Amino acid sequence: MMNWRRVILAAAVVAAPCVGGPAVAQELDYGAFKASVQPIFITKREGYTRCVVCHGGANNALRLERPGPDGFTEEQSKKNFETVSRLVVPGKPNESHLLLYPLVPQEGGSAYHSGGRQWPTKQDPNWQTIARWINGQK
């Protein structure tokens, strides 16, 4: 017996790219990530823990490589870029877990982040930096 839910789901997945014309995938810029985004994860801000303290080698979605005494190696930066990219919807910062989880819920952040809140508002300079990167800034 055929499972109709699976048939409907499969049809929706196949048809989705055709709805509304072709989708243009926006790429995330690796150079901009290294220069502007990755440093945010290790920067100490008063009243906040560095992201890498909880996420350095952690067993969660944002598993960051920890830098050595001379900073991040190229291999570490590439791994961090790959990890972080999975938490981003290119062109849509307000749908990207990377920005929503550490944002306070009152400002639209996710209630499911069990860690600290890094950003009290979307106007926070670091939130804005990551949002610009997600929007394609190079």
Q: Model-found features: residue ranges?
A:
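Bacterial N-terminal signal peptides that target proteins for export
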Residues: 1-11
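The N-terminal extracellular segments of secreted preproproteins, especially immediately downstream
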Residues: 3, 17, 50-53
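Bacterial N-terminal signal peptides
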Residues: 10-18
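Aromatic- and Gly/Pro-enriched helix-to-coil junctions and flexible linker segments
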Residues: 23-138
